[in-house]
């Protein structure tokens, strides 16, 4: 037969037989199976333990007789002896002790059978155990460091205490709380506990035991007062060495405990036994009166106030007992205190300026508020925060208190030190009914504090839908911004209150309001930062934008507006420039008219002299015809020698006469020119370009403006008669063939006729080019770019006259088209026009620009070479000068097509210094009246300030380039800024997602 398991159920046959006392069955089971004698159940108990629990002595004896283990413990570590002592069965206890049961065995809590024996009123078990307990094991301690004496004092067993003390138990052993057996005896509520206290104190009557303090500083008197055991208190205080007012760790005395718990007789007893004139206060500065007032113990308060040493003093926070009573709603105590002391200061303030009415309003004690208002309490008393009792009531939502305070004269329009009204505090507390009461009392629903926050923003911060709805129903504006630019929608989105967001948008809250901080966040940005997905989705559905999107839209609009502004500004500047040019043109025209008037006066003075010039021209024509006829007849041999001599003499006389007249005429013109130059009034208003000729008495060579040396005989000498004589001698001894002369004369006449017809054609083409000249006049940039382009083309063009070469540089060509006013003085000198002025009639095949634009004024430039200046005597005819036929072969190909004109020839040769030198090469008939060689005349022409216009154009160009760079830089910065914030937002979003959804373990 196999053995039964050790952990069988409680209903095993042998255990059932043991607990029921069925000895027959028990013996039969033991006989059939001896192994079941110590069989354990689920609790580890054996049949012997069950026989003890069932008080079955016969079964226990049978089990012990058949070899049951007497000291075998159960699962809690207790043996059959523990169970016998716990039940108080001294017969079984004696049986077990006789079978050598261990009385010092401890269970899992270190409890012995001696500890358990103190639970019963009968002392027989304790006596048996003390008889078998060794002397040193009487004070065996359990896990709480308590001995059998502690247990006896706790269960109020005075006889057990005497037995244990008689067997040498120590009454001064503290347990884990620092309490000795006297603490446990004094803390019993039974009045008979005084006997146990007396037994313990008589065992060792010392002051140290009487005033022993546990680890919290409490003495047996504290515990006796705490349990309200008046007999024990009277007994303890009756001993001479007892301290009536000991302090615990919180500096509270037994009187504090009595006042707090409302033990009026004990408080009266302690006041009688207290020999100190002062009532001590605890660590908070509170006296027993404070605790009695807080506990609503009017009798105790009356007892305390009747003692002469008790006064209503303030605690460390400055609060009196009346404030404590008002805060707890101790109406009876308040009435008692006001009754005992009619002059009590009801409006006395604490450390923070609060009164008893503040405390009652904060806790919502409506009855106390009414009592205080009836006893002269100020309804609008303010504390250090400038809060009245109404503020406290609104914050906590006490509607009845608010109505009572308003009825008692409290003002609803006051604000605290932060500028907040009671409505702000009601909204912060989420009290919708209080908000309605305050609005009904004419308080502004849009009142702003010193930070600009409204009650609606306070309610939105907490997500209080009821308050928000009440405020907006009463016309509260949801779009009001605080000092940082935040609205109620910002706070709702920041905290993720979807219902509040829906409510605000339903009342037309602006979803894209930006704050005033550096970040300029919108409500959507706050929702994104908080990761509130539902709020984000709802805001996007209602047109919300982030600050990045708003900046993109604003940048696009700003650029469009700025471009329009730039166009308007450029148009206005161009308009101003044209108006300025028009003013300059009108001024130049006025100066021109003034010069013409002066010229008319001069022409009237020279009319008589003009007649001499006309007669001289007619004489030249006749002389030319005579020379032609003479040459023809001489080579044909038809005339005789005498006739030839007579004709030669006659011709010489005529030529000499003509040259003398011409010399006189030139001298007169030079004197007139000198007079004009010496006139200071005319010199101030006229700037004319003076053409230099070769002075008499200079060296054999003369430097031309182009840098080449020209022989002296190339200039027209100051002595025309001598020059004419030399020419006559040359023509007499070196006479060309008549065919050559006639051919040359006819060629010149044909060219003259072609020049006239070509001039008419050029006039028509010139009218067509006037529009392009006007565009050139309005666009200086094109002229400057053209000059730079010609400069880069850079190959010098050379012209030849005889064996001399004239170089035409790109700067000369630019000067010909743009005017010499665009060149500096050094450039003019280097180009050969520093003295003469312009060479555009030589280098350019195109007609010169209009006199009003280019040739309005010619300046007098003093030559540094020492040559005598002469006055220019012509105006380029027809606005387009042509090059002469004499230089046609040596000029570039694009100049060779130009027809000859005598006036243009004179002016051209005068510019380059060849006028007088090549005059004898042309017949006198070709050089008509008004040419350089026959007429001297001064003409005043006003120049347009080209350099000033160039400076304006360059300045405009630089300004446009600077703006383009700034615009490009601004675009780059905006793009970088948007990229940065997009990256930052995406990083935050990924970070939040990674925190919310951590990666799964692989």
UniProtKB/Swiss-Prot annotation:
GO terms for molecular function: calmodulin binding. The lineage of its organism: Eukaryota, Metazoa, Chordata, Craniata, Vertebrata. Interacts with apc2. Binds calmodulin. Its main location: cytoplasm. The D-box (destruction box) mediate the interaction with APC proteins, and may act as a recognition signal for degradation via the ubiquitin-proteasome pathway. Keywords: ANK repeat, Calmodulin-binding, Cytoplasm, Cytoskeleton, Developmental protein, Repeat, Wnt signaling pathway. It comes from Xenopus laevis. This is Inversin-B. It is found in: Cytoplasm; Cytoplasm, Cytoskeleton. A motif (D-box 1) lies at residues 486-494. GO terms for cellular component: cytoplasm; cytoskeleton. Residues 670-680, 687-706 have a biased composition (Polar residues). Residues 586-599, 609-621, 643-656, 733-763, 770-796 have a biased composition (Basic and acidic residues). PROSITE patterns: ANK_REP_REGION, ANK_REPEAT, IQ.
């Amino acid at each position: 037969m196999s053995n039964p398991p050790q952990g069988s159920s409680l209903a095993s046959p042998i255990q059932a037989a043991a607990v029921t006392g069925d000895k027959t069955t028990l013996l039969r089971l033991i006989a059939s199976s001896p192994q079941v004698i110590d069989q354990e159940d689920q609790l580890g108990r054996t049949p012997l333990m069950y026989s003890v629990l069932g008080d079955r002595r016969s079964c226990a004896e049978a089990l012990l007789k058949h070899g049951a283990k007497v000291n075998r413990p159960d699962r809690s570590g207790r043996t059959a002896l523990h169970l016998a002592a716990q039940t108080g069965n001294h017969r079984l206890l004696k049986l077990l002790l006789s079978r050598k049961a261990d009385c010092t065995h401890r269970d899992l809590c270190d409890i012995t059978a001696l500890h358990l024996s103190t639970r019963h009123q009968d002392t027989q078990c304790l006596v048996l155990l003390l008889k078998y307990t060794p002397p040193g094991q009487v004070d065996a301690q359990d896990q709480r460091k308590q001995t059998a004496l502690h247990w006896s004092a706790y269960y109020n067993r005075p006889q057990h205490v005497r037995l244990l003390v008689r067997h040498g138990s120590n009454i001064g052993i503290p347990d884990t709380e620092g309490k000795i057996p006297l603490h446990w005896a004094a803390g019993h509520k039974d009045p008979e506990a005084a006997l146990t206290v007396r037994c313990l104190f008589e065992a060792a009557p010392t002051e140290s035991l009487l005033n022993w303090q546990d680890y919290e500083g409490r003495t047996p008197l504290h515990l006796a007062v705490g349990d309200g055991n008046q007999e024990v208190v009277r007994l303890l205080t009756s001993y001479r060495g007892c301290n009536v007012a000991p302090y615990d760790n919180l500096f509270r005395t037994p009187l504090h405990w009595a006042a707090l718990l409302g033990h009026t007789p004990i408080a009266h007893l302690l006041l009688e036994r207290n020999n100190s004139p002062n009532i001590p206060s605890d660590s908070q500065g509170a006296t027993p009166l404070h605790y009695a007032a807080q506990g609503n113990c009017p009798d105790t308060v009356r007892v305390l106030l009747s003692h002469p040493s008790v006064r209503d003093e303030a605690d460390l926070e400055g609060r009196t007992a009346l404030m404590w009573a008002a805060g707890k709603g101790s109406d009876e105590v308040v009435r008692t205190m006001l009754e005992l002391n009619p002059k009590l200061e009801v409006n006395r303030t604490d450390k923070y300026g609060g009164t008893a009415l503040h405390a009652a309003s904060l806790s919502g004690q409506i009855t106390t508020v009414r009592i205080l208002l009836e006893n002269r309490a100020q309804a609008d008393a303010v504390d250090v925060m400038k809060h009245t009792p109404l503020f406290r009531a609104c914050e906590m939502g006490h509607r009845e208190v608010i109505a009572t305070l308003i009825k008692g004269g409290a003002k609803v329009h006051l604000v605290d030190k932060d500028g907040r009204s009671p409505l702000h505090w009601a909204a912060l507390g989420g009290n919708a009914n209080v908000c309605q009461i305050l609005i009904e009392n004419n308080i502004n629903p849009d009142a702003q504090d010193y930070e600009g926050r409204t009650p609606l923003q306070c309610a939105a911060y907490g997500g209080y839908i009821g308050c928000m709805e009440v405020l907006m129903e009463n016309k509260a504006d949801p779009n009001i911004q605080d000092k940082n630019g935040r609205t109620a929608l910002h706070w709702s989105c920041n905290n993720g209150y979807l219902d509040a967001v829906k409510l605000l948008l339903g009342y037309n809250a602006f979803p894209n309001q930006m704050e005033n901080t550096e970040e300029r966040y919108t409500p959507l940005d706050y929702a994104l930062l908080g990761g509130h997905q539902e709020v984000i989705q709802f805001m996007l559905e209602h047109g919300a934008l982030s600050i990045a999107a708003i900046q993109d839209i604003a940048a696009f609009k700003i650029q469009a507006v700025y471009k329009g502004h730039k166009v308007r500004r450029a148009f206005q500047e161009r308009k101003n420039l044209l108006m300025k040019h028009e003013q300059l043109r009108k001024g130049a025209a006025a100066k021109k008219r003034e010069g013409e008037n002066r010229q008319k006066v001069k022409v009237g003075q020279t009319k008589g002299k003009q007649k001499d010039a006309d007669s001289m021209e007619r004489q030249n024509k006749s002389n030319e015809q005579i020379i032609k006829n003479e040459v023809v007849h001489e080579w044909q041999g038809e005339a005789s020698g005498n006739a030839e001599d007579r004709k030669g003499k006659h011709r010489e006389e005529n030529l000499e006469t003509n040259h003398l007249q011409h010399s006189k005429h030139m001298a007169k013109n030079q004197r007139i020119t000198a007079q004009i130059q010496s006139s200071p009034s005319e010199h101030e208003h006229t700037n004319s370009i003076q053409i230099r000729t070769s002075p008499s008495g200079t060296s054999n060579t003369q430097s031309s403006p182009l840098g080449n040396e020209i022989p002296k005989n190339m200039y027209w000498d100051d002595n025309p008669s001598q020059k004419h004589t030399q020419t006559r001698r040359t023509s007499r001894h070196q006479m060309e063939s008549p065919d050559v002369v006639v051919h040359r004369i006819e060629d010149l006449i044909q060219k003259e006729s072609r020049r006239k017809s070509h001039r008419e054609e050029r006039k028509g083409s010139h009218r067509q080019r006037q529009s392009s000249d006007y565009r050139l006049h309005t666009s200086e940039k094109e002229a400057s770019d053209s000059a730079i382009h010609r400069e880069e083309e850079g190959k010098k063009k050379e012209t030849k006259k005889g064996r001399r070469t004239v170089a035409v540089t790109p700067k000369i060509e630019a000067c010909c088209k743009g005017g010499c006013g665009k060149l500096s003085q050094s450039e003019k000198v280097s180009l050969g026009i520093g003295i003469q002025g312009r060479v555009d009639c030589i280098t350019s095949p195109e007609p010169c620009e209009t006199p009003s634009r280019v040739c309005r004024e010619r300046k007098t430039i003093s030559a540094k070479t020492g040559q005598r200046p002469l006055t220019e005597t012509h105006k380029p005819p027809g606005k387009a000068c042509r090059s002469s036929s004499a230089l046609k072969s040596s000029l570039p190909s694009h100049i060779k097509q130009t027809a000859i004109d005598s006036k243009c020839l004179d002016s051209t040769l005068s510019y380059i210094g060849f006028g007088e030198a090549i005059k004898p090469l042309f017949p006198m008939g070709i050089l008509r009246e008004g040419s350089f060689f026959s007429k001297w005349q001064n003409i005043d022409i006003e120049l347009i300030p080209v350099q000033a216009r160039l400076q304006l154009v360059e300045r405009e160009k630089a300004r446009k380039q600077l703006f383009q760079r700034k615009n490009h830089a601004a675009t780059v910065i905006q793009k970088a800024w948007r990229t940065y914030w997009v990256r930052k937002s995406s990083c935050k979003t990924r970070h939040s997602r990674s925190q919310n959804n951590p990666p799964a373990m692989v």
